[in-house]
């Protein structure tokens, strides 16, 4: 018998999905989507909407699990500085706490379910953004270093929002989503782990401040050695055309200036190695900081330079480490003051 089955429906469906896939993967769009973008856009939109809503409207959260809720929303008297999305309750611990795990929406808000919602959607969305960076570079035939550089802030955020709460046993120990909450997290982290004395944190400080210094030095050197292509009464910027093949500044002039200002080998004579250094310095340092936070999440503080100095007779030689330790004890006994029966956490 002759097969009269109509294949036009499948042909139309195939052409439709071919168009959709072509649109998703097109590098000609004003905003590249990509396979990772399908995941990234809804996740980041959900995280952003939930964060803004919670920052403005969320009711107080029982962060310590002792029935003393803490208000973080603007409608409860906070301002931009003091406002925050309060971390999930200590009564929840590290349990996954979607809204259907609570008896009702009010209970979910009271236990800080919004924090987990925002943090997990944000981390997954930021990870998808990093994957999208790699995917777009791959489509254009570029090298993959852009997504490698973005991995630094991603692992740093993952360390304070995910790894540290898991290591400490509760999302209530995660960093609050607000300005003053961030400072509170830093003070408590210092009190409990003495991170200022950790070499990995020191590397991170060198990365951030050093990266700022190197960026300012590079930008000022380039701006000071631009090749003049215009008359004296016109801005140097007019002499630059987007996509031009000619160099826009004299690296030899910048190299000669800086080499004589400091010393010869402090200056790069290769533009490629220079820009790789500018990218690698802060990225590697922030990797180390994230690693330090992640190890301290599990109370592995053995690398700290916080030991007191004892002479051969057993007498204490006062040092900066002792001053910092005393300050840490003061901060430790003051935070979560109603939740503790002892000066130190029994962690």
Swiss-Prot record:
The record marks 164 as: Tyrosine radical intermediate. One of its GO terms (biological process) is photosynthetic electron transport in photosystem II. GO terms for molecular function: chlorophyll binding; electron transporter, transferring electrons within the cyclic electron transport pathway of photosynthesis activity; iron ion binding; oxidoreductase activity, acting on diphenols and related substances as donors, oxygen as acceptor. The chain crosses the membrane at residues 32-49, 121-136, 145-159, 200-221, 277-291. This is Photosystem II protein D1. Fe cation binds at residues 218, 275. [CaMn4O5] cluster binds at residues 173, 192, 335-336, 345, 347. It is a multi-pass membrane protein. Chlorophyll a PD1 binds at residue 201. InterPro entries: D1/D2, Photo_II_D1/D2_sf, Photo_RC_L/M, Photo_RC_L/M_CS, PSII_D1. The lineage of its organism: Eukaryota, Sar, Alveolata, Dinophyceae, Peridiniales. It comes from Heterocapsa niei (Dinoflagellate). The record marks 193 as: Stabilizes free radical intermediate. Chlorophyll a ChlzD1 binds at residue 121. A quinone binds at residues 218, 267-268. It comes from the Eukaryota. It catalyses: 2 a plastoquinone + 4 hnu + 2 H2O = 2 a plastoquinol + O2. PROSITE patterns: REACTION_CENTER (PS00244). Its main location: plastid. Coiled coil: none annotated.
